[in-house]
Amino acid sequence: MTTPANAQNASKTWELSLYELHRTPQEAIMDGTEIAVSPRSLHSELMCPICLDMLKNTMTTKECLHRFCSDCIVTALRSGNKECPTCRKKLVSKRSLRPDPNFDALISKIYPSREEYEAHQDRVLIRLSRLHNQQALSSSIEEGLRMQAMHRAQRVRRPMPGSDQTTTMSGGEGEPGEGEGDGEDVSSDSAPDSAPGPAPKRPRGGGAGGSSVGTGGGGAGGVGGGAGSEDSGDRGGTLGGGTLGPPSPPGAPSPPEPGGEIELVFRPHPLLVEKGEYCQTRYVKTTGNATVDHLSKYLALRIALERRQQQEAGEPGGPGGGASDAGGPDGGGGEGGGTRGGDGPEEPALPSLEGVSEKQYTIYIAPGGGAFTTLNGSLTLELVNEKFWKVSRPLELCYAPTKDPK
């Protein structure tokens, strides 16, 4: 028994979805009208959702009509996910796909040379990575300056490990008139009452610095002061006002941070050394794409921070404190433990770091030990090393304050 023809036609009726029912038809453009399309929207239309690159050998799903690269969709089906990566509709096998040569022809019309398009993308990526590297360098320099300033401030506030012991042996620096000390005075007072034992270990003989530390501690205080001068001589005399021992050398290099590419020896200009204005040699390690302006701003910030920390430590106001550019936080602060300068005048206002600029200092180089050459601020250190230095030792630069910074 055969089925009536009208029944067959009724079963094959196309049922429209809500989207198709509300969709208005668009007329095809048959003349030479041009429509401007942004590259971003065009790229999203021609992009494969799997590899996020331009479609290559386009394959279209038969049910949901989503487009993918041939290799991408075949690999996705082989991995076990028998569904469309975009809408999760069921895909049995490669038989649910069909090639789309018309879309490939459209892509070849828009981008005639695919190799040129890929080369342009590579150039854009290289330029973006270079810009990000410069931003990372500047942020790394700022972060390093903040961390160094924080650590130096902590070193100023924290007493040295040997200062507590020498202070107690001298009978207490803050209370010179008391007869009850903490160190040898207590042990000598309680010696007759306690059981006999081994004699207390006396410190090594004191020198001329004993009288400057033990101001009110008697003879034992003088001996303790001498020991303090010998033990803390290599620390730059942090217990007293600079008479205990020679200060630490100002040009002592700090260990360079890892990851740098160029090592620098930063010295003041010889004319400044003769005048006694600057005497500190700085050792810096940084990447080759840092510019001379970066170094100038780093130097201005560093010197401003050091002067600020010297004023906070009370070095300029004390009778024995040193006030030089190379002093750092280790110079003495006068009598009384190097904290403040005694009963001196009121301290000046701390220098502000807001006006620091790379124009405050000029960078020079003396290639071959000859005349000094002023370096342009836009030059990178790698270019300076190749153009002026050309030797296999750290790059040596000199700095001096700019006479008329603009």
UniProtKB/Swiss-Prot annotation:
Residues 230-406 are annotated as: Necessary for interaction with CBX2. It catalyses: S-ubiquitinyl-[E2 ubiquitin-conjugating enzyme]-L-cysteine + [acceptor protein]-L-lysine = [E2 ubiquitin-conjugating enzyme]-L-cysteine + N(6)-ubiquitinyl-[acceptor protein]-L-lysine. Transmembrane segments: none annotated. One of its GO terms (cellular component) is sex chromatin. Residues 246-258 have a biased composition (Pro residues). Pfam families: RAWUL, zf-C3HC4_2. This is E3 ubiquitin-protein ligase RING1. It comes from Canis lupus familiaris (Dog). The gene is RING1.
